[in-house]
């Protein structure tokens, strides 16, 4: 005969709250201060979570060739910062958002330049008609799935490669590994940075692997 447990209502309410928080995932603290793209967490595993992004819009640089992700991101960010400060065809200033992402297509060798595209998330109020600007273009993602790994501190070229490898390894044997294998080969991984260079504590960065999910049916 099964034993029945009578749990206090307060305990049940707390349990439900904890479960709902786990399902929602841990959003970077920056997103409580400035706008970030919205997403749902559809799965979590050891060292990763799977997010579904709801059609985010980005303003992006052209491809930047460099041997350093850090240098390329700095170069791209300066262009994007000028853009949001009004250096666009409308002379329009735009609110800062997070994250700034760098899509990485690694080179074939350690001394060859990789290709980087740096992007700024366009706030919802500007998505209807984002201002054009020379050298920048709009990327509109459909509903997109990403495997995500968070890490702290300042981004470094060597550290990013290690974090990307760790995310890839954590997905092996999971139901999502095949979707990683089918991803867009022109963007092997994406680095998302949420903090200003002048913030020295509580820094949050992420590695994203964009997944090829047929029909976005999940």
What is each residue range found by the language model?
Residues 2-218:
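A solvent-exposed interaction/effector surface
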């Amino acid at each position: 005969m099964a034993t029945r447990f009578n749990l206090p209502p307060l305990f049940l309410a707390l349990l439900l709250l904890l479960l709902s928080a786990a399902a929602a995932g841990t959003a970077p603290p920056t997103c409580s201060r400035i706008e970030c793209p919205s997403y749902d967490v559809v799965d979590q595993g050891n060292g990763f979570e799977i997010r579904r992004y709801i059609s985010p819009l980005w303003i992006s640089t052209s491809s930047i060739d460099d041997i350093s992700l850090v240098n390329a991101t700095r170069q791209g960010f300066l262009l994007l910062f000028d853009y949001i400060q009004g250096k666009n065809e409308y002379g329009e200033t735009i609110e800062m958002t997070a994250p700034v992402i760098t899509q990485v297509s690694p080179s074939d060798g350690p001394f060859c330049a990789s290709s980087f595209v740096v992007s700024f998330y366009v706030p919802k109020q500007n998505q209807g008609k984002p201002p054009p600007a020379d050298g920048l273009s709009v990327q509109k993602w459909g509903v997109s799935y990403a495997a995500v790994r968070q890490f702290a501190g300042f981004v470094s070229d060597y550290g990013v490669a290690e974090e990307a490898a760790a995310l890839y390894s954590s997905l092996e044997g999971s139901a999502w590994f095949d979707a990683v294998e089918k991803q867009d080969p022109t963007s092997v991984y994406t680095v998302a940075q949420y903090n200003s260079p002048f913030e020295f504590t509580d820094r949050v960065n992420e590695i994203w692997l964009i997944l090829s999910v047929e029909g976005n049916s999940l």
